[in-house]
């Protein structure tokens, strides 16, 4: 028996009410954070590409929220297309951790602050590195956190690596980020900086 029919008979509800309830509880949300101040247009293009949207939809996601950064709405609008997912965007929020906690998947630029925000609330983001940044320390930190199984790194804005990371995410065996008092983050940063 179909789940909605069983619920309808059990609670004597109209089927349309059951479908609304099932939709509320089965909606899977992707949050994309591209950074608040430095635009990462290539990441916006990547997540809003037909291939990415199709893959996310096939993985069961139906909603996406894109934090595109202060003053960069035109970038989001330029690449946003109506389709199989409900997609909304916003410049900035004082509660990015709250946005992340509501998401089933976080896709993030490799900025240490955003990555750590996600890890601290128990999310394991798919991280995309902006290789165009000068003196890019982000890749070293992201790769170290990947080696420790805290997140997935798709590399630069390469769609093949990104799609592979999206597909791996659900089945990947992540490790939880240790508590800050254990000093792992400080060690990672010190080790990374010492190699520069």
Curated annotation (Swiss-Prot):
Catalytic activity: an N-acetyl-alpha-D-glucosaminyl-diphospho-di-trans,poly-cis-dolichol + UDP-N-acetyl-alpha-D-glucosamine = an N,N'-diacetylchitobiosyl-diphospho-di-trans,poly-cis-dolichol + UDP + H(+)
GO cellular component entries: endoplasmic reticulum
Listed GO biological process terms: dolichol-linked oligosaccharide biosynthetic process
SUPFAM superfamilies registered for this protein in UniProt: UDP-Glycosyltransferase/glycogen phosphorylase
GO MF, one example: N-acetylglucosaminyldiphosphodolichol N-acetylglucosaminyltransferase activity
UniProt-listed Enzyme Commission number(s): 2.4.1.141
Location within or outside the cell: Endoplasmic reticulum
Primary site of residence: endoplasmic reticulum
Keywords: Endoplasmic reticulum, Glycosyltransferase, Transferase
Root EC class: transferase
Stated role: Involved in protein N-glycosylation. Essential for the second step of the dolichol-linked oligosaccharide pathway.
Record's subunit section: Heterodimer with ALG14 to form a functional enzyme.
Family: Belongs to the glycosyltransferase 28 family.
Stated name of the protein: UDP-N-acetylglucosamine transferase subunit ALG13
Taxon lineage: Eukaryota, Fungi, Dikarya, Ascomycota, Saccharomycotina
Gene: ALG13
């Amino acid at each position: 028996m179909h789940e909605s029919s069983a619920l309808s008979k059990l609670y004597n509800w109209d089927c349309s009410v059951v479908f609304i309830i099932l939709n509320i509880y089965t909606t899977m949300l992707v949050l994309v954070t591209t950074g608040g101040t430095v635009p990462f247009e290539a990441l916006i293009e990547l997540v809003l590409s037909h291939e990415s949207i199709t893959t996310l939809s096939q993985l069961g996601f139906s909603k996406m929220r894109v934090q595109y950064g202060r003053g960069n709405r035109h970038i989001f609008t330029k690449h946003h297309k109506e389709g199989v997912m409900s997609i909304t965007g916003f410049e900035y929020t004082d509660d990015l951790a709250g946005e992340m906690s509501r998401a089933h998947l976080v896709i993030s630029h490799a900025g240490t602050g955003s990555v750590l925000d996600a890890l601290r609330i128990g999310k394991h983001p798919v991280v995309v590195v902006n290789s165009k940044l000068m003196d890019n320390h982000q890749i070293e930190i992201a790769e170290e956190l990947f080696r420790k199984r805290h997140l997935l790194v798709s590399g630069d804005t390469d769609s093949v690596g990104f799609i592979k990371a999206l597909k791996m995410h659900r089945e990947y065996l992540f490790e939880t980020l240790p508590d800050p008092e254990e000093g792992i983050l400080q060690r990672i940063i010190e080790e990374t900086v010492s190699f520069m």
